[in-house]
């Protein structure tokens, strides 16, 4: 009978990524998150986990997390250091800018924790550019891969990969850099790829709802949009952008055409995984976040709205009965979903620890 591994979660947010860890045999004992509203939600979802709220750069916070982890013999660490400094949606798109962005140095506190705690298994995840990140170490620009190899190469096997959540059971295209460290003498292989799950398979059985309407299902209601936005999207076919419409085209109040990218005001497709869900999934003008819709008898399309919270949950791989309080602000839920690594990806990666050892 396998023995459960005790775990630590750094930069946990509300803990979406770790949601299924208990199913594979990893029990998160302690977590750390800076932003209070995310940490408070984490504590409500995981009432038995110890949440340390505060900045990990604060030595008192760092030591508190470390001491709890040591006391509980933590042997697994998962860390998702903030990615805004590396995100392609951000401004820092070249190595030199990233090296001067203080947010990108938060990974050094993960490294410091590993050196103190020495867990058997470590999973660090972030946007794909993480693997190209270079930081100033002793006044020298050094790739993150070299930093980790120099610090831990003698004790750990270190693996660098870019994985797409859609290849591991999540109905969403979401590529993440995955760094795995496992102590020498242990094995940690990648999981086998799985069958692709489409948007239709994930949310196709949910009732159709229009903007401002409620289905009666928890978290499945149509977010409110302007009459003009609804009109544009009603005339936009599945998989298309309103910017491709000949008549019902996004316009300003004075009638002038809005300038924008074809990824905006765009319906997603039914027959493939959803595009990457972004933090602005509440805005119908944002990237590829409008319901696919279905053709109606009058020639328009249904569901002229952004995806509902329930649809976002399913497309992230979360269950309908995800334990979030009823009074959780919708925008907070949308933000943490837009930032998270899908939990089925983490589950599949970590299950290999137990399959091999």
Swiss-Prot record:
Q: Where is the SAM-dependent MTase C5-type domain?
A: 5-357
What Pfam families does the record tag this protein with? Answer: DNA_methylase
Known EC number: 2.1.1.37
Residues forming the catalytic site:
83
Name any Gene Ontology BP term.
Answer: methylation
Its catalytic activity? a 2'-deoxycytidine in DNA + S-adenosyl-L-methionine = a 5-methyl-2'-deoxycytidine in DNA + S-adenosyl-L-homocysteine + H(+)
List the Gene3D superfamilies hit by this protein, alphabetically.
DNA Methylase, subunit A, domain 2 (3.90.120.10), Vaccinia Virus protein VP39 (3.40.50.150)
Any one GO molecular function term: DNA (cytosine-5-)-methyltransferase activity
Listed NCBIfam families: dcm (TIGR00675)
Report the protein name in the record. Type II methyltransferase M1.HgaI
The encoding gene is hgaIAM
